Amino acid sequence: MGIAFILIVIAIMTYALLVMPRTTMRPDMSDLLTNYAHRGFFDNNDGVPENSLEAFRYAVLGGFGIELDLQLTKDGEVVVFHDYTLKRMCGADVKLSSLTLDELKGFNLLNTGYKIPTFKEVLKLVDGKVPLLIELKGESGDDSLCPAVDALLDNYRGAYSVESFNPLLLKWFKNNRPDVVRGQLVTNLLKEKKGGSFVRNLALTAMLTNCLSRPDFIAADQRYLRGLSIRLCTQFFGAKLFVWTVRKKEHFDINKENGDLSIFEGFDPLS
């Protein structure tokens, strides 16, 4: 009985240490504690595509923070785009990473006149008017996106944070830019039946990889907010909770009542 109890205690302590967010020398997040327009304030059915300069312009006009997605082109340029292929947004079944920036500029977003913007163009447009929530895209151990993004942000004077599903990308910022606020994106990969091994998906769902990145906040799927690791990080260790993707005003209001922040789309939370 004594040995079993000790083993249980060790297991609980190990789990807590793996899941634990950053708890010391936390950076100031006060300028980031707002709600964010998911991929800008867009309407894909009304001529304002997601992750377009126009969607970001509308978010700035509304005073909303902006959540956006970053990837690298074949020639190493940082662009703003969510999917790994152009099929859904541009009608071409080709990987973004296989194209140069000049080649990407030959495509329009959803039959509009808008192009896939560079991160540099977005920074110039936003110019510190609203905070940025920057998702770093990438499913492998290649972290070359991180220094490229950091170089563009080096002279940017607006408020921003980075987030990713990939803890290895957050680890780069932990090791090289600990002053930058970083957040772990999480969903239930087991229930969503995403690709990858069971062990990988279990570890990411339970955020056992937080030991690599020690995030400052958790950006959690609206559908899976009751996960034990999410509650441990936010309610016990005090990490801030960002909730995505909030598509109903009633969920937005509940998050607000709970003191949580929303990454929203499809409605105006001020109306």
Regions found by a protein language model. Give the residues of each.
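Phosphate-group recognition and catalysis centered on beta-loop-alpha active-site segments
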Residues: M1-S271
